[in-house]
């Protein structure tokens, strides 16, 4: 239960107004730090929810596929430039961000990941790498300002962050093909 407490502390910390204002003031930090930290907070709280609602997880997410689909939908939604803008200007959308990333992305991701077959995990790696590559191209190549609240230079910085993430995920996927994980369990 210590892990759930750490997740709750992280969650509350990320919602503090000064922390939120600082994280959302720079586009790359908003997308590549604040949002993943909300997902991590949800992942840390997952064991608490699994103990409190065991039937929900065993019935709803028995093979991990529904949870990983929900995770992917939420992640794709928050990658759209329009949603980042709306999170800064519409309080209801920001509240949705505070709820959806930890509880609709982080919790299902942790619950699903150990249930997924290796083949499905590989599909997720390839999909995320391709999506991040596309988002990198979108943010770097676009001559127009995609987010009204951020400068074009911040948009390009975010795009290069997506290039880095796409490359890292792809390299990790390639190394999983050559390393037998059962040797390290």
Feature-to-residue mapping (PLM):
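Alpha-helical membrane segments of multi-pass proteins
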Residues: 1-185
């Amino acid at each position: 239960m210590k892990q759930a407490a750490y997740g709750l502390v992280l969650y509350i910390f990320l919602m503090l107004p000064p922390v939120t204002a600082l994280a959302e003031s720079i586009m790359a930090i908003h997308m590549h730090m604040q949002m993943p930290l909300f997902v991590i907070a949800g992942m840390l709280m997952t064991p608490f929810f699994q103990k409190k609602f065991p039937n929900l997880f065993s019935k709803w997410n028995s093979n991990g596929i529904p949870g990983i689909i929900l995770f992917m939908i939420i992640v794709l939604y928050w990658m759209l430039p329009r949603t980042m803008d709306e999170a800064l200007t519409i309080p209801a959308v920001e509240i949705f961000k505070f709820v959806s990333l930890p509880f609709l992305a982080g919790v299902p991701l942790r619950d699903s990941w150990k249930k997924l077959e290796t083949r499905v995990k590989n599909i997720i790696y390839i999909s995320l790498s391709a999506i991040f590559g596309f988002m990198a191209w979108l943010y770097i190549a676009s001559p127009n300002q995609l987010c009204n609240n951020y400068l074009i230079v911040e948009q390009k910085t975010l795009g290069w962050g997506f290039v880095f993430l796409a490359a890292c995920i792809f390299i990790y996927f390639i190394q999983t093909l050559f390393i037998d994980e059962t040797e390290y369990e």
